[in-house]
């Protein structure tokens, strides 16, 4: 347990290191506002903080920098998030894929780090199906999921269906099967095909087949924006190994997906510092994440990935407001 003096010094050291990225010495801390301690006393307290694993001394400097453990204590017990107005443009209600891409770009532009959004899992349930004639015996099947995701598939048929038949098939599917999974629709169509006994039965079966394929892709899509922002971060630009590992992480996406999937199980903003998540074992990176909703149901996760030396108070604000903007845009999409 740290006493008030140690907490004050750790807070000042972390804030100073986040601000300029330079190891902080006792003389610098003695000049900090609110610290009325001699350099000798500060050195003694800093030695205690180092023994506790909260700060460390780079080999090239007499100053100290926070460790991941020090950042964690700072974030959990000393960080004050100012609720100052954060200027962020609204996310216009559009196609979900477009809104999600815009959210990732917004995260990266506001943070100047990397913005990440996990798109909602596609549902195998459909909300609406329509048919559009493209040419003779060539038709477009338009499938809308409950989340508003629109999938278009082209089918070729042996019969050149009329517009009236297309409308009839669409009406039958939407009135009888809306809200069911495509596999359920497929089975029910098989049992009812004898009853239907008309040309549109084959059309509906073809639509269900392509719809099942379109909506069965349950792989999470990770949208990443702003990777090049790390080139301007001294923590990475000065170390090619760190930079290479970071870009490998973004390219593979698997670890990011697992980490954000874990964070979706919690309410509010989550912070992962360095390798403490054990999913992304990268001491130089931190992740600030939050879930987002559609009509009150949690459907995905977003976040900012940047250096461990990041202004956590501002990142929390950015992630929180973007989560709310994305939830609003997806829920109010027409």
From Swiss-Prot:
InterPro entries: GAF-like_dom_sf, HrcA, HrcA_C, WH-like_DNA-bd_sf, WH_DNA-bd_sf, WHTH_HrcA_DNA-bd, WHTH_transcript_rep_HrcA_IDD
Keywords per UniProt: Repressor, Stress response, Transcription, Transcription regulation
GO biological process: negative regulation of DNA-templated transcription
GO molecular-function terms, A-Z: DNA binding
Pfam families to which the protein is assigned, alphabetical: HrcA, HrcA_DNA-bdg
Task performed by this protein: Negative regulator of class I heat shock genes (grpE-dnaK-dnaJ and groELS operons). Prevents heat-shock induction of these operons.
Entry similarity comment: Belongs to the HrcA family.
Protein name in the entry: Heat-inducible transcription repressor HrcA
Organism placement in taxonomy: Bacteria, Pseudomonadati, Pseudomonadota, Betaproteobacteria, Burkholderiales
């Amino acid at each position: 347990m740290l006493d008030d003096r140690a907490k004050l010094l750790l807070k000042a050291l972390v804030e100073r290191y986040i601000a300029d990225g330079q190891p902080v010495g006792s003389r610098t801390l003695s000049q900090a506002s609110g610290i009325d301690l001699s350099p000798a006393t500060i050195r003694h307290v800093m030695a205690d903080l180092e023994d506790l694993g909260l700060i460390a001394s780079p080999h090239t400097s007499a100053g100290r920098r926070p460790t991941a453990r020090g950042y964690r204590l700072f974030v959990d017990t000393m960080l004050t998030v100012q609720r100052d107005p954060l200027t962020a443009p609204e996310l216009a209600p559009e196609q979900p894929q477009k809104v999600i891409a815009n959210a990732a770009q917004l995260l990266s532009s506001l943070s100047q780090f990397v913005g990440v959004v996990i798109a909602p899992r596609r549902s195998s349930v459909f909300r609406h199906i329509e048919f559009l004639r493209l040419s003779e015996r060539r038709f477009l099947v338009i499938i809308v999921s409950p989340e508003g995701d629109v999938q278009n598939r082209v089918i070729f048929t042996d019969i050149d269906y009329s517009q009236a038949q297309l409308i009839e098939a669409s009406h039958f599917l939407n009135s009888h099967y809306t809200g069911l999974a495509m596999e359920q629709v497929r089975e029910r169509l098989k049992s009812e095909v004898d009853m239907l006994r008309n040309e549109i039965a084959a059309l509906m079966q073809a639509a269900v087949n392509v719809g099942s394929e379109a909506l069965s892709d349950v792989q999470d899509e990770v949208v990443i924006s702003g990777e090049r922002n790390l080139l301007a971060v001294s923590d990475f630009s000065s170390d090619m190994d760190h930079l290479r590992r970071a870009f490998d992480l973004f390219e593979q996406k698997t670890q990011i997906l697992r980490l954000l999937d874990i964070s979706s199980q919690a309410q509010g903003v989550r912070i992962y510092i360095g390798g403490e998540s054990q999913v992304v074992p990268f001491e130089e990176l931190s992740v600030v994440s939050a879930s987002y909703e559609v009509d009150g149901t949690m459907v995905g996760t977003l976040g900012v990935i940047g250096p461990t030396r990041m202004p956590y108070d501002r990142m929390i604000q950015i992630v929180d407001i973007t989560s709310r903007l994305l939830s609003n845009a997806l829920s109010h999409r027409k």
